[in-house]
């Protein structure tokens, strides 16, 4: 429509964790295309992070690569101090990073559980605590990337599903606390998406052939495809836009309708 802004995030600064690949990469690039300068937080792959930064800069936006180990929440505050030095503000915080050991619950080790919750819960809270002062009274946006494992049992996802369920509870609490400050807080809960981590989960977590598993999921998904990083990025782009100023405290399932399919229908489809 003629009244829409070409670059709805022009002049804003976005921080995206886990942004060197997969969904995080797609989110960072979409926000940059919408006009935002971006902080590309990553754990260890500096080459891929550098490629994302280069793509953002080719779009005419500023970008800052920032290495951080979110399994150590104490690193979060210093990281946001660097963001403040570089940009002086933050308007959008997307907590995308996650990690877990894809194992049955009875095989989980304490350090795996602790690391999963350190990244999904402790570092998320530390990030919000650090970012709120940088929003400086302007309308702010916080988006957490959750998953359908917070709503239903997914094989070998017990620990991550528990962490994501806790994450969505925090989203609701933060939405109530931060709403009066003009900050919205929402979650996106993707299903199976075409990402490196999804392939790793299928092949190593449940010992299935990736292409076969994807084909079976497509067969029982109402829209007859699986998601891409760009699908998540499009939803995040809406949630951080001015158009979503009245939407907060929600966890939106993004799975092409798969969780709405009954078990009977799945059996009939051979899923």
Residue ranges and their predicted role:
Residues 13, 20-21:
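Conserved glycine-rich cofactor-binding loop
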Residues 77, 99-115, 156-159, 199, ...:
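Conserved mid-core segment of classical short-chain dehydrogenase/reductases
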Residues 139, 179, 184, 247-249:
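Short, small/polar-rich loop/turn modules that mediate ligand/substrate recognition or access, typified
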Residues 133, 176-180, 245:
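Alpha-helical segment proximal to the catalytic Tyr-Lys
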Residues 2-5, 237, 248-271:
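Short C-terminal tail/terminal secondary-structure segment
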Residues 99, 106-125, 143, 160, ...:
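Catalytic Tyr-X3-Lys loop
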Residues 141-166, 171-180, 192-193:
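Catalytic loop of short-chain dehydrogenase/reductase
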């Amino acid at each position: 429509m003629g009244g829409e802004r070409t670059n709805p995030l022009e002049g804003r600064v976005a921080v995206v964790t886990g942004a060197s690949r997969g969904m995080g990469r797609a989110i960072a690039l979409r926000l940059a295309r919408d006009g935002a300068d971006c902080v590309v937080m990553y754990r260890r792959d500096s080459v891929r992070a550098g490629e994302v930064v280069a793509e953002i800069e080719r779009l005419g936006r500023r970008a800052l690569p920032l290495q951080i180990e979110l399994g150590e929440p104490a690193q979060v505050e210093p990281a946001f101090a660097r963001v403040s030095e570089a940009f002086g503000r933050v308007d959008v915080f997307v907590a995308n990073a996650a990690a877990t050991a894809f194992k049955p619950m009875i095989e989980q080790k304490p350090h795996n559980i602790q690391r999963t919750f350190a990244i999904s819960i402790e570092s998320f809270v530390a990030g919000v605590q650090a970012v709120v002062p940088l929003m400086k009274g302007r309308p702010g946006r916080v988006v957490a990337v959750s998953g359908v494992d917070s709503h239903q049992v997914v094989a070998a996802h017990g620990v991550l599903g528990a962490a994501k369920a806790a994450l969505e509870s925090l989203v609701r609490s933060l939405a109530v606390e931060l709403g009066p400050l003009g900050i919205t807080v929402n979650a996106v809960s993707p299903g199976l998406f075409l990402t490196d981590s999804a392939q790793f989960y299928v092949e190593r977590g449940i010992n299935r052939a990736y292409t076969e598993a994807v084909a079976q999921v497509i067969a029982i998904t109402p829209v007859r495809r699986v998601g891409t990083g760009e699908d998540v990025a499009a939803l995040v782009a809406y949630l951080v836009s001015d158009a979503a100023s009245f939407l907060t405290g929600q966890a939106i399932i993004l799975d092409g309708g798969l969780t709405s399919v009954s078990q009977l229908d799945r059996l009939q489809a051979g899923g």
